[in-house]
């Protein structure tokens, strides 16, 4: 793959222009499970960024000596290595978050974004651009999850990062039965897909308006 793109443009393109969840509609399955709170969404976003960035770097580094016949197996092994590293790191230093995320950290290996960047980009370009492309793809995935989680946590629990944003005096009580109640729909998994769908729709509107210009 020959290109005149600067190294930084790989990062910015992956972060915004070719955002994987919003443009390619990849990596959306975890939006169901890890976006109920900002903490879990942020952690998953950073974990995927770490794995995608460094896995892409290593895949690119070994691209000229990796036989085509075992290419995808080699990529899976490399991705698995970094998934295990981040999983053990979370268990050692952020045990409560790791416990909340449960198996979903380990399932990063099945995330379409990670393998997709390794297969479509990292094995065709040099290590530094590959790392920046992977990092941008991971962070692009992460900010989408965080946006969804902010809405879900705020309206589902009345908090952001565990801090109460909606004052408790606004909530319904025996004295004020008509007060505010948390929106239970936001705690349920389908709300993540609805919110993601709205984000994809808005992105398509913006892209279409720019094309018309």
Curated annotation (Swiss-Prot):
EC numbers on record: 7.2.1.1
Example GO biological process: sodium ion transport
Location(s), subcellular: Cell inner membrane
Annotated GO CC locations: plasma membrane
Membrane topology per record: Multi-pass membrane protein
Keywords tagged on the record: Cell inner membrane, Cell membrane, Ion transport, Membrane, NAD, Sodium, Sodium transport, Translocase, Transmembrane, Transmembrane helix, Transport, Ubiquinone
Disulfide bonds: none
Catalytic reaction annotation: a ubiquinone + n Na(+)(in) + NADH + H(+) = a ubiquinol + n Na(+)(out) + NAD(+)
TM region positions: 14-34, 42-62, 77-97, 101-121, 131-151, 154-174, 183-203
tRNA processing recorded as keyword: no
Entry coiled-coil feature ranges: none
GO molecular function, one term: oxidoreductase activity, acting on NAD(P)H, quinone or similar compound as acceptor
Family the entry assigns: Belongs to the NqrDE/RnfAE family.
HAMAP family (UniProt xref): NqrD
Subunit description: Composed of six subunits; NqrA, NqrB, NqrC, NqrD, NqrE and NqrF.
UniProt protein name: Na(+)-translocating NADH-quinone reductase subunit D
Species per Swiss-Prot/TrEMBL record: Chlamydia muridarum (strain MoPn / Nigg)
